[in-house]
Amino acid sequence: MLLFPLYGLGTQFLVLPTDAEELSIGSHPTMSGISSVNPALFSASLNHPGLSISRGIWLGDVTLTHLGYTQPAKGKIFHFNAKYSGLSDLEFRDAVPLDDALSTFSSYGVSMNSGFSMQGEKQKFGISFSYIFMGLYTEKSSGFGLNLGYARDIFKGMKLGITIQNLGIMSKLSKDTPSLPTRMIGGVSKQIIFNDYRNTIYCSGEWNQSASTGKFYFGNNFRWDRLSLMGGFSASENVVASSAGFGLNLGQYEITYGIQFGSQNLGTPQILTFQFQLP
């Protein structure tokens, strides 16, 4: 029998972008928000709960869905995130070529995590715990992960951040045990404010246990009044990608769109994000 690779999406769905801002600028541990990659930098606007809903598509027509919620309480920011990535209409075929597949099936991954962040003098700490579930055809696996984060204001709008993600284990499939894509991201950012304009430059590097080489991210977020213009660039050994996006802040609501162009020619990732400031 010829089968789709056993892991399908695999646990790598855990490192896919969660919202339009991350897709547009990159995975930076100094970028705060409802869906920050750094558990230390989850934020809630004006001490109100925040809700984020994202929907998009990744390479190879993989669908992306993400829900984020943050709640300030007693000097801490508590957060909950749910993430789904799926690939449908995979074909099951014999070794003998046929016009029609014997059947179709899907591959998917689900992650739910919650935790909190707290602030000290010029620094923040964060932690979150994840429940992970993935499946392909009749195969299923589940497990738990731990995410840690730290951020520090250095001076004059410059920030340092580091996060370690996906420390944990998964249950065994029929033959093998999936491994989590443990990764560490470190980076710096610099914010420049001039009159009504605010520009933030990001630079980060990533080490991923499942990758043979590191990955570098460079991004920029320019804000003027209610408008945001974003751009980014990422590079690893064999893959180079550029990205862009824009956002519109309508007070209690914000809409953000991001798109990425890469050298793999496997599709054009896009994500649309809606954020709400709750009462």
Mark where each language-model region is:
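Subset of outer-membrane beta-barrel
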Residues: 6-279
